[in-house]
């Protein structure tokens, strides 16, 4: 699962990406890679960061989805992270 984070402020986005990756690592352990800049790191006025989450093929995706949504809600609950845009790509390439 690719998790894309978008924001207009690059320094704030880097902080958001590090914070989200840390929270995901507490849940998923070493299956979290990143954050990293994708090949196209900016589209119009939005900067982009990518976090990769490796999930086994036999693992229940429903539980993973619930955990991802929970982390996203925790992130957007903070005032400084309200402008965070999150996009999930469950079938990259």
Predicted regions and their residues:
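Accessory helical-bundle/CTD segments and flexible terminal tails appended to RecA-like ATPase motors
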Residues: 1-93
